């Protein structure tokens, strides 16, 4: 079986291969730091060997719970924010039919999401669409007190209990939370919800291969065994024992850090496959939260191509030369669509007649790569044989491993996120939360 692979040839120009390979010692030292567990944030390294440590019994428990929800529910709402939401959304959007909710012969519940915003209209419309439907809830929160998911759960829990009664509701609610502590753990134990544990040593943005991601992905009918198998294979391929020249996570980390040192402050993750949009959203959180601190860090952005060539394409081609691209390039499609011949040929496209649409897309990808490289945009390519659970598992672990290496190379702790507390402190003060009286008085004086 093929694996995803990395090609940095088109990134060389701003930096040379020699410059990238000059980072070998540092990159391998950072991998060793990860594996030895003696670096910053070493209490959050549970993701490092997570794929290979998942047992068959754990997968079976998740699958059985998913089957219960699938048997009872036509809609399942996954409540979570950040890493408790984006990994699931990325996999489901990539592997389900693009128009899944319109299919008449669907075998799996519709997956909906809540708790990733505080939009009143969004919650109202979600509540309205759930009326009269058999629905369940997967509530994902380590503490149970994070504002966005806690609000959503309070509202949807009441709606579910009002609709089916507390006794039945408890069989349709699954809590994924801390093993012993927190408001959600307390509630789950009181109400008798089925629960899964968020490991203490796995941060949210690294949690997609824990029950946080695996349960809702299984509910959607996607093989979590294939997803985990892909991650296991990439765990082996990027191990500390794998030499730098063969270790794609190390080379990616070294290349992007060398580009950063040479003025490339923005990394754009691009794809030419519309189903990968939320892979990029997951990636942006992974790298943004991991590296953006201490006044440092590459800014992670993303584009969906060819769509965004008609909006951001101009900036990428001719704007400030502070960017580089990483392109996820998918080799094979799942379906075949041929361009038909049109007798009038008013659109002038008969020269494409008989070709697969993907051939047109591939030439757009190649032409774009050449244009951007000619325009001074270094281009890293991640080759993906096809969009499948196995290869997404590989992709997830590759980006996670490279993120840990890259953060250490940058000189930051890639496993904390102190900056996210600033807005929460202000929000609670403005909302007059008990215990924030002094902060409330101070912040209101500024308004």
Curated annotation (Swiss-Prot):
A Gene Ontology BP annotation from the UniProt entry: glucose 6-phosphate metabolic process
Classification via CDD domains: SIS_PGI_1 (cd05015), SIS_PGI_2 (cd05016)
GO MF, one annotated term: glucose-6-phosphate isomerase activity
Chief subcellular location: cytoplasm
Record's GO cellular component terms: cytosol
Localisation per UniProt entry: Cytoplasm
Pathway connected to this protein: Carbohydrate biosynthesis; gluconeogenesis; Carbohydrate degradation; glycolysis; D-glyceraldehyde 3-phosphate and glycerone phosphate from D-glucose: step 2/4
Keywords, sorted A to Z: Cytoplasm, Gluconeogenesis, Glycolysis, Isomerase
Keyword Isomerase among record annotations: yes
Keyword Cell membrane: no
InterPro entries assigned: G6P_Isomerase, Phosphoglucose_isomerase_CS, SIS_dom_sf, SIS_PGI_1, SIS_PGI_2
Chemical reaction(s) catalysed: alpha-D-glucose 6-phosphate = beta-D-fructose 6-phosphate
Active site: 289 (proton donor), 310, 424
Record Gene3D superfamilies: Glucose-6-phosphate isomerase like protein, domain 1 (3.40.50.10490)
Pfam families hit by this protein: PGI
E.C. numbers: 5.3.1.9
SUPFAM superfamilies on file: SIS domain (SSF53697)
Reported function: Catalyzes the reversible isomerization of glucose-6-phosphate to fructose-6-phosphate.
UniProt-listed PANTHER family: GLUCOSE-6-PHOSPHATE ISOMERASE
NCBIfam families named among the record's database cross-references: PRK14097.1
Family in the record: Belongs to the GPI family.
Protein name: Glucose-6-phosphate isomerase
Species the sequence originates in: Parabacteroides distasonis (strain ATCC 8503 / DSM 20701 / CIP 104284 / JCM 5825 / NCTC 11152)
Lineage, highest ranks first: Bacteria, Pseudomonadati, Bacteroidota, Bacteroidia, Bacteroidales
Gene that this polypeptide is encoded by: pgi
């Amino acid at each position: 079986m093929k694996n995803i692979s990395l090609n940095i040839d088109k990134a060389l120009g701003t930096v040379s291969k020699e410059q990238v390979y000059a980072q070998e010692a540092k990159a391998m030292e950072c991998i060793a730091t990860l594996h030895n567990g003696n670096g910053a944030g070493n209490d959050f390294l549970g993701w490092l060997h997570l794929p290979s440590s998942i047992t068959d019994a754990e997968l079976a428990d998740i699958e059985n719970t998913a089957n219960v929800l699938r048997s009872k529910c036509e809609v399942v709402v996954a409540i979570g924010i950040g890493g408790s939401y984006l990994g699931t959304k990325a996999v489901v959007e990539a592997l389900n039919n693009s128009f899944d909710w319109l299919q008449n012969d669907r075998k799996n519940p519709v997956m909906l999401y809540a708790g990733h915003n505080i939009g009143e209209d969004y919650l109202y419309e979600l509540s309205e669409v759930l009326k009269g439907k058999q629905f369940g809830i997967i509530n994902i929160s380590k503490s149970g007190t994070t504002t966005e998911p806690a609000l959503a759960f309070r509202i949807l829990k009441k709606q579910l209990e009002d609709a089916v009664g507390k006794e039945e509701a408890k069989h349709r609610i699954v809590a994924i939370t801390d093993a012993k502590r927190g408001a959600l753990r307390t509630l789950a134990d009181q109400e008798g919800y089925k629960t899964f544990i968020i490991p203490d040593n796995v941060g949210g943005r690294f949690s997609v291969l824990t029950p946080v991601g695996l349960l809702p992905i299984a509910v959607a009918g996607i093989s979590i065994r294939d997803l985990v198998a892909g991650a296991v294979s990439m765990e082996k391929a990027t191990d500390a024992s794998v030499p730098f020249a063969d270790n794609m996570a190390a080379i990616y980390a070294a290349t992007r850090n060398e580009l950063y040192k040479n003025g490339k402050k923005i990394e754009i993750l691009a794809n030419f496959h519309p189903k990968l949009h939320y892979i990029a959203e997951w990636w942006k959180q992974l790298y943004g939260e991991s590296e953006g601190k201490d006044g440092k860090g590459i800014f992670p952005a993303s584009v969906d191509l060819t769509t965004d060539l008609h909006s951001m394409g101009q900036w990428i081609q001719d704007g400030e030369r502070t960017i580089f691209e990483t392109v996820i390039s998918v080799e094979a499609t799942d379906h075949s669509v041929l361009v038909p011949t049109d007798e009038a040929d008013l659109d002038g496209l008969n020269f494409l007649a008989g070709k697969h649409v993907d051939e047109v897309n591939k030439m757009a990808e190649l032409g774009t790569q050449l244009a951007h490289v000619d325009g001074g945009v270094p281009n890293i390519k991640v080759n993906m044989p096809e969009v499948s659970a196995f290869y997404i598992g590989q992709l997830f672990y590759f980006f996670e491993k490279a993120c840990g290496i890259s953060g250490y190379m940058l000189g930051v702790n890639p496993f904390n996120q102190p900056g996210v507390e600033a807005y929460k402190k202000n929000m609670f003060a403005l909302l007059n939360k008990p215990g924030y009286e002094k902060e409330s008085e101070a912040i209101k004086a500024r308004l």
